[in-house]
C-alpha cells in the first residue's frame, strides 16, 4: 500500500492531520486515536484498539472547535465511523507511514517517530535527485 500526500506549500495547513488525511471526519478520527493513545501512555493493546474502533462504530461524542482566535466556537457532535473503514483508512495508513508501530510479540500499538525520519529521508532523496546531472 502506498499513501500519497499532496499539499500546497503556500497554503500548508497548520494541522498535520489535515495534510495527511483527505476528509475532516478522517482528521477527527485520527486525532481521537492519537489522543486515546497519549492518555494510555502512548501505547495500547490490540483489544483496546478493537474497543476504540467499536466505540467509534457505535458513535462517540466529541467537542469540535471552529474559528480562529477570539472567535472560536465549541460544539458537541456525535461522530460515527465504520469499524472496517477505521482499520482501512485510518489505522493501516498510520502504520504504513510510520505514525504508529505495531509490536507483533506484545500485540500493542505504539505512537512512533518514524514518520518524521521518513519525511527527512524523502527530503534527502529530493536533494540527491536535484544534484544529479541531466540525462542526455
Positions of the model-derived regions?
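DNA-recognition alpha helix
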Residues: 45-75
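Short, amphipathic alpha-helical interaction segments positioned at domain boundaries
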Residues: 114-136
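Short amphipathic alpha-helical interaction segments
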Residues: 77-97
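Long, low-complexity, charged/polar intrinsically disordered regions in eukaryotic proteins
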Residues: 1-42
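Structural motif
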Residues: 103-105
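Minor-groove-contacting beta-hairpin "wing" of winged helix-turn-helix DNA-binding domains
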Residues: 107-112
Amino acid at each position: 500500500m502506498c499513501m500519497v500526500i499532496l499539499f500546497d506549500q503556500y497554503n500548508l495547513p497548520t494541522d498535520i492531520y489535515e495534510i495527511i488525511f483527505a476528509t475532516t471526519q478522517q482528521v477527527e478520527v485520527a486525532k481521537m486515536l492519537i489522543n486515546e493513545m497519549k492518555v494510555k501512555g502512548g501505547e495500547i493493546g490490540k483489544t483496546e484498539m478493537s474497543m476504540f474502533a467499536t466505540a467509534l462504530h457505535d458513535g462517540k461524542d466529541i467537542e469540535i472547535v471552529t474559528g480562529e482566535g477570539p472567535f472560536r466556537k465549541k460544539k458537541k457532535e456525535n461522530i460515527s465511523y465504520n469499524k472496517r473503514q477505521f482499520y482501512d483508512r485510518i489505522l493501516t495508513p498510520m502504520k504504513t507511514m510510520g505514525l504508529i508501530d505495531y509490536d507483533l510479540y506484545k500485540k500493542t500499538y505504539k505512537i512512533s517517530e518514524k514518520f518524521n525520519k521518513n519525511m527527512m529521508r524523502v527530503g534527502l532523496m529530493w536533494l540527491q535527485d536535484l544534484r544529479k546531472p541531466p540525462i542526455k
